[in-house]
């Protein structure tokens, strides 16, 4: 269900506002080892239970009529989109085989290739060295640690119409002294939903109910939170109708709060609800225009100038596409509503434009990102102007600053020395939209003692990132950032920051 309604090294909190500080969790090394062994044995038991199932060869009779059809490719494995894979391709004996395909495609009825069970695993090991989280101010942490994430899933397809998808997770953070809720969850359900697909009125209707990972658009303001150990899951109901170039999506979502006290103790956050409707039209190729309305409800939200129940009505318009080397993604968002006795009026604009020299060696892409989000210009005027970035993407701003009260200009150069390798170098300048509001650190925490301090300049950072897809199953990534702070952060007790991340991932 490629709805993409509601990334990245980030330290995203469970809810996005100036409140909800992270609470360190106590743990011992022997507890982590015991819980990880339990998770591993659970995954191994699931695989062993199904290992007796019929082999792929048993589907050859059902696939004999496929000889006149083109050979379909094996699904591409993406860690955040495992539920979208269609492994019925393995019902065709002409498709190239790999080890353990007998567990990747377990036919339930050889006469109906679309009825099957598929098992899968993700493993990600990430080393991080962070010289100054939160620029060394606001109880920031410095040090080095490992983020280790293990996921395993079962995907049951009952023909073309019914899907039952369940994914478990085991995440630990050895070496991290101060654990946040997104760092560790030793055994819990990441996704568990039922999906229904039906033809309707010349189009396709898709319904999905349960716990799931979802994203909005470019993931500026609502990402899957790929970087930390724990992705952002939602207990949600989704309806998706697609016909021709038109796509209409409705959603009601409650983000899942993670905790690590007992196995399977994550729960829906009933004090934070996001609902809305999106309409999208694809003109040709990748060119599209979309708009959505969303209602954001957060109880007991805290900002620098006001506390109360936050209610935002959100209107977002986005266009994206690519034509002859030129690509673009431009998005504008308006937020209105109330919090406590104050009204809310905030805006943001996000843009990324690039041009790729497709006929030049290494296919260099020259890109420019420009982003603006409002802050609160007058804390005493009974109107809150601070933009709420909802569930933002950490990588987008190098994971140091947040989107509220921001001006961000970032030129970048990306090259491809090999088809499976990309290298990106970027430098960015950041300013506050207004000095009356604070500097915000990721995801949207106000840095103490920065509101009202003269000087809009926040700092400049340089970033280098490399990605290498070694095989369809293995990938390697490297990321390095140096952030030179401005005067407002320095007066608040901050210092320049450095970050290095090295990541190895595996998907089966």
Question: What label would you give each PLM region?
Answer:
Residues 496-508:
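Outer-membrane beta-barrel "beta-signal"
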Residues 96, 101-119, 155-161, 198-205, ...:
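Short loop/turn motifs that connect adjacent beta-strands in outer-membrane beta-barrel proteins
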Residues 123-131, 168-174, 211-215, 243-245, ...:
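Transmembrane beta-strands of outer-membrane beta-barrel pores
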Residues 73-82, 86-97, 304-305, 331, ...:
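Extracellular/periplasmic loop regions
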Residues 2-6, 14-16, 20, 25, ...:
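N-terminal periplasmic/intermembrane-space "pro-region" immediately following the signal or transit peptide
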Residues 129-148, 156-204, 219-224, 261, ...:
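Surface-exposed loop and membrane-interface regions of Gram-negative outer-membrane beta-barrel proteins
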Residues 119-121, 166, 207-209, 239, ...:
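Membrane-embedded beta-strand positions of outer-membrane beta-barrel proteins
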Residues 200-207, 220-379, 436, 449-453, ...:
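Signature for the C-terminal beta-barrel architecture of outer-membrane proteins
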């Amino acid at each position: 269900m490629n709805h993409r309604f509601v990334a990245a090294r980030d330290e995203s909190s469970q809810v996005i506002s100036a409140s909800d500080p992270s609470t360190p969790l106590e743990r011992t090394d022997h507890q982590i080892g015991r819980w990880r062994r339990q998770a591993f044995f659970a995954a191994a038991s699931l695989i062993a239970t199904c290992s007796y199932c019929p082999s792929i060869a048993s589907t050859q009779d059902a696939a004999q009529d496929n000889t006149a059809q083109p050979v379909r490719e094996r699904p591409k494995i993406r860690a955040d989109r495992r539920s979208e894979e269609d492994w019925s391709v393995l019902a065709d004996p002409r498709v190239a085989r790999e080890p353990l395909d007998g567990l990747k495609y377990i036919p339930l009825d050889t006469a109906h290739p679309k009825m099957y069970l598929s098992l899968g695993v993700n493993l990600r090991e990430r080393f991080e060295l962070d010289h100054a989280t939160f620029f060394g101010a606001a109880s920031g942490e410095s040090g080095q640690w490992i983020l280790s994430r293990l996921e395993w899933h079962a995907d049951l397809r009952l023909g073309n119409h019914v899907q039952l998808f369940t994914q478990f997770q085991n995440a630990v953070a050895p070496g991290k002294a101060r654990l946040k809720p997104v760092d560790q969850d030793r055994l819990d359900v990441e996704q568990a939903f039922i999906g229904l697909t039906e033809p309707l009125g010349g189009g396709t209707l898709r319904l999905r109910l349960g716990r799931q990972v979802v994203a909005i658009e470019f993931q500026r303001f609502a990402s899957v939170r790929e970087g930390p150990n724990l992705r952002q899951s939602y207990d949600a109901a989704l309806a998706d109708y697609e016909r021709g170039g038109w796509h209409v999506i409705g959603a009601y979502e409650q983000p899942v709060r993670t905790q690590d006290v007992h196995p399977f103790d994550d729960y829906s956050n009933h004090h934070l609800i996001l609902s809305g409707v999106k309409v999208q039209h694809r003109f040709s190729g990748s060119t599209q225009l979309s708009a959505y309305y969303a209602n954001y409800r957060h109880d007991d939200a805290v900002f620098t100038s006001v506390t109360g129940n936050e209610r935002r009505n959100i209107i977002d318009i986005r266009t994206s596409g690519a034509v002859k080397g030129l690509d673009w993604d431009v998005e504008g968002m308006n937020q209105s509503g109330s919090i406590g006795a104050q009204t809310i009026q905030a805006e943001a604009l996000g843009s990324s434009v690039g041009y790729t020299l497709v006929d030049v060696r290494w296919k260099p892409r020259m890109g420019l990102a420009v982003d603006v989000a409002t802050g609160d210009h007058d804390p005493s005027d009974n109107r809150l102007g601070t933009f709420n970035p909802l569930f933002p993407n950490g990588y987008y701003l190098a994971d140091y600053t947040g989107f509220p009260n921001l001006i961000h200009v970032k030129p970048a150069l990306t090259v491809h020395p090999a088809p499976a390798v990309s290298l990106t170098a970027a430098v960015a300048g950041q300013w506050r939209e207004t000095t009356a509001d604070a500097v915000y650190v990721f995801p949207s925490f106000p840095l103490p003692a920065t509101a009202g301090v003269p000087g809009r300049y926040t700092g400049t950072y340089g970033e280098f990132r490399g990605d290498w897809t070694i095989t369809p199953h293995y990938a390697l990534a490297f990321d390095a950032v140096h952030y030179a702070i401005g005067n407002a952060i320095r007066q608040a007790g901050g210092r320049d920051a450095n970050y290095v991340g090295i990541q190895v991932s595996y998907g089966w």
